[in-house]
Amino acid sequence: MGQPIAIEVRNVSKRYSDDPGLAPALDNVSVNIADNEFFTLLGPSGCGKTTLLRAIAGFEHVSDGEIRLAGETVNHLPPFKRRVNTVFQSYALFPHMSVAQNIAFGLEMQGLDRKTIPGRVDEMLALVQMEHLAGRKPAQLSGGQQQRVALARALAPKPKVLLLDEPLSALDLKLRKEMQVELKRVQQEAGITFIFVTHDQEEALTLSDRIAVMSAGKILQIGTPIDIYERPQHRFVAQFIGDINFLPGQLKRGEHNENIFVPNGMPVEIPCPPQGVNGSSVQLAFRPERSQLVAADQPHHLRGVIEAVLYVGTATLYQCRLNNDIKVMLRENNEGLNRGRAVGEPVAVHLPPQACLLMEA
């Protein structure tokens, strides 16, 4: 990355017990996060993402390793001395205070000149587009409005980094999508680093400049949303980010020294990317939307039968049982030219080479 580094996490581990039989909450985690970056920690419950966020904030002491903020080691510093603020899932607004008073509270605790506080509050109200609601109490606000107030309050003291612990999870789907757009806008306008924790894959792909996918206390892969979705380096990452199918089989060399995948139990040869070793057992992975359903009499394709049809509005999902008894999920966009397909219908599946990923068996 060409930008200056905002946060450095170096070989950080966190253990809650000295019992060697218990896995650590964080296991030798390292990552650099740039200034002004929207960086997401993504993973299932219990993967360590919130523990890492809390360690950066200073709410958790690390067992090993180092956390640096703008080049300074902060392991020994309490949270209030780290120039890092946190937005929690619960928002934690003061119910007896107005919107403006909630935003001003952190500035008052910081000892800011009282003459400058109203101007800073006005800036934050404008940033989150809530000038007209400055006098309301939290109970008079919607969930999305409360989230904006919590965001404004956290940004008001001008932290170096803002940490967000699943702040959208309590909102309904429509409001959550609206707030995703708002959150990205606020981050770009505020011009500071956001570190965002979520288990929602779509949320991570939508918001992030880069994503770290975590499992069992480890970071498995760091990359842009396109890298993570299109080029997963681990089976867990491939399965956790979106839907994906796996076919076991063998690699061999074609006539022109290209890679050819032969699925187990099927006399089909599928051109695939230049990965792997000739003769090695591998898994061919492909996304449902990257495959193409074609007529069953087409040669050189996977063959199978449709077992289930799921209409999802803009697309239809087809669960197919291939002739080697492997089940795969396929997706077709619902366009005017598409004809409906029925359960029991024989089909063939075309996999373009660019749709194929090779992974270890």
UniProtKB/Swiss-Prot annotation:
InterPro entries: AAA+_ATPase, ABC_SmlMolc_Importer, ABC_transporter-like_ATP-bd, ABC_transporter-like_CS, Mo/tungstate-bd_C_term_dom, P-loop_NTPase, PotA-like, PotA_ATP-bd. Keywords: ATP-binding, Cell inner membrane, Cell membrane, Membrane, Nucleotide-binding, Translocase, Transport. Coiled coil: none annotated. It catalyses: ATP + H2O + polyamine-[polyamine-binding protein]Side 1 = ADP + phosphate + polyamineSide 2 + [polyamine-binding protein]Side 1. It is found in: Cell inner membrane. The keyword Chloroplast does not apply. It is a peripheral membrane protein. Pfam families: ABC_tran, TOBE_2. ATP binds at residues 43-50. GO terms for cellular component: ATP-binding cassette (ABC) transporter complex. SMART domains: AAA (SM00382). The complex is composed of two ATP-binding proteins (PotA), two transmembrane proteins (PotB and PotC) and a solute-binding protein (PotD). Belongs to the ABC transporter superfamily. Spermidine/putrescine importer (TC 3.A.1.11.1) family. This is Spermidine/putrescine import ATP-binding protein PotA. It comes from Pseudomonas fluorescens (strain Pf0-1). The gene is potA.
